Amino acid sequence: MRTSASTPSAPVSTGAARTGAGHASRGRFAALSRFLPSGRSVAIGVPFLWLAVFFALPFVLVLKISFADQVMGIPPYTSLVEIKDGVVHFALQMSHYAFLLQDDLYIATYLSSLKMAAVSTVLCLLIGYPMAYYIARSEPNRRNVLMMAVMLPFWTSFLIRVYAWIGILKDDGLLNHTLIALGIIHTPLRLYHSDAGVYIGMVYSYLPFMVMPLYAHLVKMDLTLLEAAYDLGAKPWVAFTRITLPLSKNGIIAGSLLVFIPAVGEYVIPELLGGADTLMIGRVMWDEFFNNMDWPMASAVTVAMVLLLLVPMALFQYYQVKELGDAK
């Protein structure tokens, strides 16, 4: 009887031990998971880490070169740290940044770049908003086809697309030939090697960057708000300015930044379509780097441009945080 009574006790103690070990293992995993990033954090953090590394490291290198002096050698700039007689000396040159503020050419170039980028952004908005609105209000099947047409230019090399505009805009190109044949003009329009050609090239190249964020906001808009406005007697223009436009405000800001920021430093379009008097900061940086071999001056121009572009980005970030705070 003692043997039969003691027989069930072994499985019970073994099961209890396994249960205790399982709880302990889950407890250790739960404690460890507190220090590990979640799946969402990893999905968002890895691309940000990638961009930070491949943006921050080159920027730090350019920033370092901007404080050096130009020399004829490889590399064509001096070292910032020198050791003489066991003493470390730092040779930081601020003359390049001072020259940016004193030279009229650089100031005019920055202002011209900002103006051309701003005008191109406004033109992209005026053209892209009706396009995005029409696509968002189309049938789903047609909507997919239209968005595919918007993204279709990205399947072709950017350089080839800009080169194609040379054949369209030059004096004996397709556009002037068509306008003269229709009797609209009698002499060719000077579009190639001019600021007008640069505007056309930038609007064409950056228009999809305006359309896509606008479409993303317009397609999610609640159409019952417009129906309620019409039921209350609002005219279409009033409903658009009071409902549609405010609800698409974030799309306008995002699209404008996606166009404005790369347009400021654009080099290929003004180099191929612009004239000799077309002042863009990208062309100045190229000349300083490769023609003058003045890497410190070119780096200072680059750093100043990046700092200049941080202002609208910081304002946009502040606005987004404020919007989220008001929503809560």
Language model features with spans:
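Interhelical loop and adjacent transmembrane-helix boundary motif
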Residues: 34-40, 83, 97-100, 104, ...
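N-terminal signal-anchor/first transmembrane alpha helix
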Residues: 23-67, 134, 144, 148-150
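Transmembrane alpha-helices
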Residues: 46-47, 148, 152, 204, ...
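Membrane-interfacial helix termini and adjacent extracytoplasmic/periplasmic loops
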Residues: 29-33, 80, 84-85, 162-203, ...
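C-terminal transmembrane helix and the adjacent membrane-cytosol boundary/short C-terminal tail
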Residues: 5, 15, 23, 27, ...
